[in-house]
């Protein structure tokens, strides 16, 4: 797969690579897979690619979306797709904070470090990522959406960022804290991760000559 997702996280644009004989009829394969996996999993497209294509390592960027429902009353139809927050959020403050994450940074303050493979594993994993876009939007009727695009994401990075943005939106910390958190590299200083159900792996970008 192009990206790994935690339990409860959704994926609209997940990409999967597989080695198949040339005789395979892709439209027929799609129908067969959808009959086996649906309705919670759906294959929306199947195409042939170059032999050296890799769903994860050929990708140039990934984008995620996180949805927040900021209303006094919960919406039963959004229980599994949004984080419901009752107290009013200051969207302007959240957007100011999101501007700070754009660019190349060490996101250790927002990443869960990989566990060592064994007691002899001393490899230091890099948490440097290049964020190309990060933006909050008000979609109306209390629905807020956060979109972020980067070359890659480390474990729980988006959920930790969203959790921190929400604390800023609730005036628990100022927008200027975001830059300081990035510089600190200290996971304990950032907010707990946001719930998984609001997050979607939305799209994965590849070079134009992949197929």
Where are these regions (language model features)?
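Structured-RNA-binding interfaces characteristic of tRNA pseudouridine synthases
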Residues: 1-211
């Amino acid at each position: 797969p192009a990206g790994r997702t935690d339990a409860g996280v959704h994926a609209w644009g997940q990409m999967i690579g597989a080695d198949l004989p040339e005789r395979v009829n892709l439209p027929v394969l799609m129908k067969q897979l959808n009959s086996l996996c649906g309705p919670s999993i759906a294959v929306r497209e199947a195409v042939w690619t170059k032999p050296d294509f890799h769903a994860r390592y050929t990708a140039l960027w990934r984008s995620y979306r996180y949805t927040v429902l900021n209303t006094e009353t919960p919406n039963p139809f959004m229980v599994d797709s949004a984080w419901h927050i009752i107290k009013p959020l200051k969207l302007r403050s959240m957007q100011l904070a999101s501007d700070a994450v754009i660019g190349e940074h060490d996101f250790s303050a927002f990443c869960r470090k990989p566990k060592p493979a064994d007691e002899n594993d001393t490899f230091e994993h890099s948490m440097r990522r290049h964020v190309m876009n990060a933006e909050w939007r008000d979609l109306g009727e209390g629905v807020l959406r956060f979109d972020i695009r980067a070359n890659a994401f480390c474990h729980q990075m988006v959920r930790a960022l969203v959790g921190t943005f929400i604390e800023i939106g609730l005036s628990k910390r100022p927008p200027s804290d975001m830059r300081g958190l990035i510089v600190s590299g200290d996971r304990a200083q950032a907010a707990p991760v946001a719930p998984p159900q609001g997050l979607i792996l939305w799209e994965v970008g590849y070079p134009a000559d992949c197929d």
